[in-house]
Amino acid sequence: MNKQIQTEADELGFFGEYGGQYVPETLMPAIIELKKAYKEAKADPEFQRELEYYLSEYVGRTTPLTYAASYTESLGGAKIYLKREDLNHTGAHKINNALGQALLAKRMGKKKLVAETGAGQHGVASATVAALFDMELVVFMGSEDIKRQQLNVFRMELLGAKVVAVEDGQGTLSDAVNKALQYWVSHVDDTHYLLGSALGPDPFPTIVRDFQSVIGKEIKSQILKKEGRLPDAIVACIGGGSNAIGTFYPFIKDDVALYGVEAAGQGEDTDKHALAIGKGSPGVLHGTKMYLIQDEGGQVQLAHSISAGLDYPGIGPEHSYYHDIGRVTFENASDTQAMNALINFTKHEGTIPAIESAHALSYVERLAPTMSKEDIIVVTISGRGDKDMETIRQYMAERGLAND
């Protein structure tokens, strides 16, 4: 494995040609302050101890790495292990990062938080830590996503957050990020922007990756204990890329195949997809250079996915770099493929995954049968499907699948 891979952003915040700090001058002092504070916190054993305490006692880590016996047998190939991020408090991987950033904000003396959310999982995780640490929180959420995720909106409000509907654009995650950044610019003195994915201006991609890499670190020690070796392949779904980068990062320099699964929406040959790598090109959005779905004129296009957490038109800078150097292979799953995998997996394993995670499972169902029974695949179940029950029910009813 090539040991020359760049695994940290350079001084200007770039991974290869991706990343950077494309923000208005007014935000630069806050970005510089954040970078300095994070560097100090990262090197402070007391901060790390506090983070570990809350991850263990509040979030419920370590999450299990479960051998999926029935699923493995049904696919007839490689052994499949599930990294159970769905078992975290709040039901997804998002809490790992929300908790870390809230502790960082507290350390910086910030009393208020602002966040964006798509599926509502990052919003719920942010509202949870805001309640825990007695901080105010404003969450921006696209109006379209609010319709899809009523239950999560109620959860956030119950936890004390103020949820603001974003009507601009398509009313989804990308528009919510725009609004959250604008809000941060005008409230920068007392507010920390709790960004939920591995994107945005440097140092956000690094901060989010570091707080999420607990996933991959745990996988590494767990699989060595269970199998005495590293897996042959690791699979994770990709929207902005936080669960995937957290899963992959500890394995970047190991001889392990890494697969990121993007949302192909209604299909690669339509314009209703979220294939930033598959059909995009490099561009700048939300403060960073990364792969984006855009037209020839550089206009960012609307992303589509049945999963509210994957309909983002970009993919974080570190993933963009790993794609260019060939370290991570990007595959995709359509809405239909993801939903079929969700139904199949649930019937075999008794676990209802989030629709996001089902995109990764769809690729596992294609990959596993091509591998030998001695091979090992680890797939990250990034979240549980509770938030998606209405979407799943509707999908199955429309197709007459309800009683299959």
From Swiss-Prot:
<protein>
    <recommendedName>
        <fullName>Tryptophan synthase beta chain</fullName>
        <ecNumber>4.2.1.20</ecNumber>
    </recommendedName>
</protein>
<keyword id="KW-0822">Tryptophan biosynthesis</keyword>
<dbReference type="GO" id="GO:0004834">
    <property type="term" value="F:tryptophan synthase activity"/>
</dbReference>
<dbReference type="InterPro" id="IPR023026">
    <property type="entry name" value="Trp_synth_beta/beta-like"/>
</dbReference>
<comment type="subunit">
    <text>Tetramer of two alpha and two beta chains.</text>
</comment>
<comment type="pathway">
    <text>Amino-acid biosynthesis; L-tryptophan biosynthesis; L-tryptophan from chorismate: step 5/5.</text>
</comment>
<dbReference type="InterPro" id="IPR036052">
    <property type="entry name" value="TrpB-like_PALP_sf"/>
</dbReference>
<comment type="function">
    <text>The beta subunit is responsible for the synthesis of L-tryptophan from indole and L-serine.</text>
</comment>
<dbReference type="InterPro" id="IPR006654">
    <property type="entry name" value="Trp_synth_beta"/>
</dbReference>
<dbReference type="GO" id="GO:0005737">
    <property type="term" value="C:cytoplasm"/>
</dbReference>
<dbReference type="InterPro" id="IPR006653">
    <property type="entry name" value="Trp_synth_b_CS"/>
</dbReference>
<feature type="modified residue" description="N6-(pyridoxal phosphate)lysine">
    <location>
        <position position="94"/>
    </location>
</feature>
<keyword id="KW-0057">Aromatic amino acid biosynthesis</keyword>
<dbReference type="Pfam" id="PF00291">
    <property type="entry name" value="PALP"/>
</dbReference>
<keyword id="KW-0028">Amino-acid biosynthesis</keyword>
<dbReference type="InterPro" id="IPR001926">
    <property type="entry name" value="TrpB-like_PALP"/>
</dbReference>
<comment type="similarity">
    <text>Belongs to the TrpB family.</text>
</comment>
<keyword id="KW-0663">Pyridoxal phosphate</keyword>
<keyword id="KW-0456">Lyase</keyword>
